[in-house]
Amino acid sequence: GTPGGEYRVVEVNPRVSRSSALASKATGYPIARVTAKVALGKRLHEIENEITGETTAAFEPAIDYVVTKVPRWPKDKFDDVEFELGPAMKSTGEAMSIGRTFEESLLKALRSSEYDPAVDWGDVPDGELEAEYLERPTPDRPYAILEAFYRGYTVEEIHELTGIYEWYLERFGRIAEAAESARNGEFEPAAEAGFTNQEIAAIAGGEFNDTHASWIPSEATDADAEDGRQVETDGGGTVVEDVEADTSRRTFKQVDTCAGEFRASTPYYYSAREPPTGRGASEVQIDRDIESVVVVGGGPIRIGQGVEFDYCAVHAVRALENMGIDAHVVNNNPETVSTDYDTSDGLFFEPITAEEIADIVEETNADGVMVQFGGQTSVNVGEPLEDELGRRDLDCEILGTSVEAMDLAEDRDRFNALMDELEISQPEGGAATSR
């Protein structure tokens, strides 16, 4: 859009594209399937909606949630490249998130993108924050906006610097306010805004034990050691345990194409942090007494990790189903087959973090988790997930190669030491890095 309210069409594709794939995943409406049937002569009212089983393709999808898509920027591979927004495409993939509010959906999308700004905001003065990070449209800008609000900037000031509509900036401001509340010991506003318990604990002065965070204010990580309120806990336990005791749990909602007007039977879910007086309990329709396994997907496509790993995840799901075991997928990439609602027994469109996967394990009563089929993303979540499952005392294990063995194989120094200990010959080698 433009300041005058006009919209400019950049391109039109007369075919199924990544945009239509995103629209399908966001609404649950099977655009490609319906398009194929229309091309064969079917009318919309003759095509059944498989999700509800009661309506037809002539019903326009209605949604009662917010969907956010963010690009995956390969800044970790090209540290010296300028990733300023322009006519040339520089992202390698994308992540999608679903939440009840814009704030919740945005924070889930930032976690899902697995992007970590290579900047310590505590070392960035206001002038540099404005000139380098707010005025310039770069991958760091969303985090800079949150940091600016946390420093006391107003909506009007940030609007002047970024040109972003005030409605969106007001939501960014609410996220920053929720973080400030968490820093002062009020955890529920941060939970409802979409922060994870691990993120809230880190904001409050505790440790962060997970793979990726959406945003943690610089002041929270630079807190004064003498500031007792940062590390005090109510019950003598860890900060994250206090956060869990004082906040609402995640409930899982269904993507049904009709905003709850008709009963849906397709197992396509997303989580929401709502207070007990919210819109009801979990909507998951899964038999918790059947043996089941959670398969962790690969998240957004990046250099070195593409759709070949999604192929692995989908075939893992099919192998489990052939064995009579329910397979549940957790992933957030709208471009993949694993996030089709009819690929698995349960699709959870969620960030790939230990906390959120552990919530899915609790919800489904899963017997095991497979992290070997999503590339480095899913392997990286193995260790914190094992810790989280143990902390919650859940009867669920990482299946296949153990987390310890995975680390042993990936850590070249440890692997070389093991080969020497076992007296197994290997070529001489070394590692070098420019950073």
Question: Which positions does each model-derived feature cover?
Answer:
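Acidic/polar loop patches that form or flank catalytic/metal-binding clefts of enzymes
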Residues: K42-E50, V119, E156, A201, ...
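Active-site nucleotide/adenylate-binding loops and adjacent lid/helix of ATP-dependent enzymes
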Residues: N13-P14, E362, M406-R435
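Short, acidic/small-residue loops that bind anionic groups at enzyme active sites
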Residues: M323-G324, R391-M406
